[in-house]
Amino acid sequence: MKHCLTLISSILLCSVYLAHGQVHPDTALTRLVEGNARFSKGESIRPNQSPNRVKELAGGQNPFAIIVGCSDSRVPNEIVFDQGLGDLFIVRTAGQVSSYASWGSIEFANAVLGAKLIVVLGHTECGAVAAAVNVPEVPGHVVTLINAIKPAAQATKNLQGNRIESAVKMNVAMQVNQLRQLEPVLSKSVASGQTKIVGAVYHLRTGKVEFLSEEYILAAR
């Protein structure tokens, strides 16, 4: 019991301390947009990657944004947004499919570490989304990922154009809506205006991140 109380006290103190250093979600979004612009132009400045930064972070972390992204090795989040050590709290799974462990990680970064911007980041030519569209035979637990993405594949099956890329965007939009409604932490923080959750798609062939419009995301509910 004593250990539990100590842990709870530590978390609360951490929360209070970090609240003073929180970055407004709009400011955080601007940082990401500007960082990706540098990266896609080949003008990355690679901030916060010095030995001094390593030592500084040994005392704690204060990321300014949370990225919920795909595990694809071609989309390293810190690099495509031109950020450094301790800047981003990243949760990655194939197809950026979220479940209880992911939700707990996101809530921890939001409520305890103070990151008030959450970006759901998909990408073009996503293998997990392609599998949900084409429904091939897959091994083991891969089917759980495909099943989670199938609603996006079904919602876009009659659209003209590239069906996989349409499903990629729809999958991101549906995941944004899911997180916005996630109780009790995120839904309240979003409703109060403290937290912003947005969706984006990284384009493998250009290095550019496209942020989805709010109209598109709301239409996917």
What spans do the regions from the language model cover?
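Catalytic core of membrane glycerolipid acyltransferases/transacylases, capturing the structured
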Residues: R74-V91
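Positively charged n-region of N-terminal signal peptides that target proteins for export
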Residues: M1-L5
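Glycine- and Gly-Pro-enriched alpha-helical subdomains that act as flexible
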Residues: V119-N134
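Bacterial N-terminal signal peptides
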Residues: T6-V16
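Structural recognition of the beta-strand scaffold that forms the well-ordered cores
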Residues: I66-G69, F89-R92, V119-L121
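Active-site alpha/beta core segments
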Residues: Q61-I66, D72-E78
